[in-house]
């Protein structure tokens, strides 16, 4: 059952917002996220370009001029990637995430795409339940390895060699 909050929520194309506004709402939805993933406007613009995010078909949830959430749609070769779903923490569990997801699925269908995929952080049980409810299913586990940034070149190894005849 979708709540009255979700019913009163408008889904607006993300293209109607600036990159700065999108970065702001995205970051607000992630303040308590399992894995910190903040993005400034420049980094979000790079993400949009790298992952072929279609802002015209991506969505922002809006109610009474208040941004409540965001969801983005990446499009490549007949496939849709539903990504960057986020809902403000104090408005979660009211159907906004579901409304955004259903909106993205509808946007993909408008593009004649019927293969939708997504990723979810392993311990994000609420999102995982939502995705299963919407007909998605697990196909595997993606392992992401990260190393700390490397700021200086490694020390040069100096070796001495001597010819032995």
Please annotate each region the language model reported.
Residues 119-121, 132, 137-150:
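Conserved catalytic-core motifs of GNAT/GCN5-like acyltransferases
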Residues 64-67, 75-79, 123, 139:
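Short strand-connecting beta-turns/loops that link adjacent beta-strands
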Residues 8-24, 156-165:
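A short beta-loop-alpha structural element at the N-terminal edge
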Residues 101, 108-121:
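Conserved GNAT acetyl-CoA-binding A-motif
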Residues 87, 93-106, 129-133:
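Conserved acetyl-CoA-binding loop-helix of GNAT-fold acetyltransferases
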Residues 60-62, 85-92, 121:
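A short, internal acetyl-CoA/4′-phosphopantetheine-binding micro-motif in the GNAT/acyltransferase core
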Residues 74-83, 92:
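A conserved beta-turn-beta hairpin within the catalytic core of GNAT-like acetyltransferases
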Residues 23-30, 34-72:
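Active-site rim helix/loop that mediates acceptor-substrate recognition in acyltransferases
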């Amino acid at each position: 059952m979708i709540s009255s909050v979700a019913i009163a929520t408008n889904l607006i194309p993300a293209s109607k917002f600036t990159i700065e506004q999108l970065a702001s709402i995205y970051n607000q939805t992630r303040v308590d996220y399992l894995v910190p993933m903040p993005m400034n406007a420049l980094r979000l613009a790079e993400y949009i370009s790298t992952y072929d995010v279609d802002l015209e078909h991506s969505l922002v949830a809006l109610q009474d001029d208040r941004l409540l959430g965001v969801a983005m749609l990446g499009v490549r070769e007949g496939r849709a990637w539903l990504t960057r779903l986020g809902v403000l923490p104090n408005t979660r569990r009211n159907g906004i995430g579901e409304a955004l997801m259903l909106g993205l699925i509808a946007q993909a269908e408008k593009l004649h795409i019927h293969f939708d995929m997504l990723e979810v952080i392993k311990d994000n049980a609420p999102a995982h339940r939502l995705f299963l409810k919407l007909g998605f299913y697990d196909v595997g586990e993606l392992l992401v390895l990260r190393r700390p940034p490397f700021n200086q070149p490694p020390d040069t190894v100096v070796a001495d060699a001597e010819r032995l005849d």
